[in-house]
Structure formats: C-alpha cells, structure tokens
Amino acid sequence: MSFYDKLLKIDRRWIYLLVAIAVIVPLLKPLRLPVTLTEPAENIFKKIETLPEGSHVLISVDFAPSSEPELKPMIVALYRHCFAKKLKLVTMTLEAAGAALAEDALSITVNEFNANYRDDLAQKGEEYVLDKYGVLKGADEDYLVKGEDYTYLGYKAGYALVVLGLGDSFTNTFSKDYSGEATSSQPIFKDMKSLSDLDLMIDIASTAAVEMWITYGKERYKFDMGAGCTAVSATQYYPFLNSGQLLGLLGGLKGAAEYEKMIVDAGYWVKPGLATTGMDAQSIVHFLTVVIVIITNFFYLIRKRRAGEKTNF
C-alpha cells in the first residue's frame, strides 16, 4: 500500500481527536481572534445608545435549550448594555422551554451588576445592609431593584394572542410576574402600560416568533424592533431589514460575539463573554475542516495520477 493510500485510509478517530483539540484548546485558553462588526448588529447597539435613561425596553426570549449556546450569550450581552444605560427592562418568553433560560440569564446579569455595586461600597469602606429579600437598603439608582429597574414576566401560552394582549395592557395580560408578584404594583409599569409605550423591542428567537412579533406587534403598535436568531436562520430576516421592519439583527454566535465586543469597547463591560470564546473554537474547527478537505483531495488526485487514471473535474 502506497503512502497516499495509507493517508487516505487513516483511522477517522484521529480526525475526531484533532477536532476535539481544536475545540478544547481555544475554550481553555481563548485566542481572542478579531471580531468584525456588521451593520445589522451595530444598528441595535446604536439604537440602545441613543435611548435616554429610563427608556422602556422589552426583550422576548423565544428559544429552547437546543439554541442556548448561540442565543443565551446574546441576551446576556443585551441585558448588560440595557442595565449599563439605566434603561427600564421588561423580559418575557413565548416559548415554554425558554422560561428558565430567560430567568437564568437575567439573574446572572442582575447579580453581576449588584455585586459590583456592593464591591464598590466595600472598597470605599462603606457598610451596607441587605433586607430579607437580599435587596440592599438605601441604595442609589445604580443598584438594580426588581419591579423598578427590571422585571421578568415569564411564559404565557397563546403566542399571537399574548402579543395582542400586551398591545392593550402589560398588567392585564400578565397579572403576575414569574415569581408570582402582582405586576400592577410594580413601578416599572407606571409609564409602560402597553406595547405602544415601548422605546425598543428585541426578540431573540429560534422559531418563527420574529415574524409574529412583526405582524402582530410592531406593525400594529409602531415600536422600534430588533431581532436575534440562530446563524442558520439569519438570512431569512434580511428582507425585514431591507423593508425597515427590523432596525437590526444579531445572527448566531457571531452576532453575540459582535455585541460582546461593542459593549467592551464602549466600556460597559470588562471582558468578552462566552460568545467570543465560542467563536475562537468555531473558527479554528472551520479552518481545520477546510485544511483536511484540501489535503485529502490533493493526495487523492496525486494517487490517481500515479496510478495512471484519468481525473475528472
């Protein structure tokens, strides 16, 4: 057996090993490969940048655990930006399987901001006291308070009917939030009674929820809307960008990495998150795949020519 035959018949487990190494190494030691920004992603960032303090933002988390690696870093980055800009954030989901994902992402972000606030107080030598709910007593506006600065409505069945209900009233459609507290008593809804009062709505989805939000939400109640989706479905939303029905779009892990880069560059966060690290691994694996395809095809052609066979292209 010739060298070329041996190479072409190599045990595929060696390839699996190379792919595993290409994934694990960048995750353990991020390469920080450059992330190129795209206009659709920048448009969402710029829109949030223009919103004055106290503006109302709704983020709908409409995806299941199968899309979590791509889309969860996206919503965490958006939450960080909204909180850094001191916007009033309402989040919800139309996907039953996404209820826990949205809560987890929101909890992570809120705890990060409030932990940083408490650390700043400790460094200044100032004492602080938490109430029985874990809320810091006497905190200023930089401390995030549930029901005032943010709220999580949770899941409600009905899809388009839920959106139409929100167009009439947030508190009537969701009488209680995800933790069971009455929404009518939450200060965040004092000036945000329905979808018409929104300054921005962003749908992060792995389903057809984006089209539904456009049809029954944006077009009826005239709020600005952006979207985030998995990479495989990003192209289907470009017509909505071209028509102006979407002001911006985050596509897959790349879109999440772009947003992480923008909030870091703007000084809202210290370092890139999971999406940027994931893009390192994804890029290396893609490069490795291309190299393997080129090498194997090259040796295949060499073997054919040495054997005197005609090669068809």
What are these regions (language model features)?
Residues L33-T50:
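Alpha-helical transmembrane signal-anchor/signal-peptide segments
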Residues S66-T151:
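Membrane-embedded segments
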Residues H56-P65, L89-T93, M201-I202:
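Short glycine-rich or small-residue beta-strand-to-loop segments that form or flank ligand, phosphate
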Residues R306-F313:
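Short, Lys/Arg-enriched, Gly/Pro-containing loop segments at transmembrane-helix junctions
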Residues K6-P30, Q282-I302:
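Hydrophobic alpha-helical transmembrane signal-anchor segments
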Residues G147-Q236:
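Membrane-proximal low-complexity regions enriched in glycine and acidic/polar residues
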Residues Q245-S283:
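Short, aromatic-rich amphipathic segments at membrane interfaces
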Residues F45-P73:
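Short extracytoplasmic
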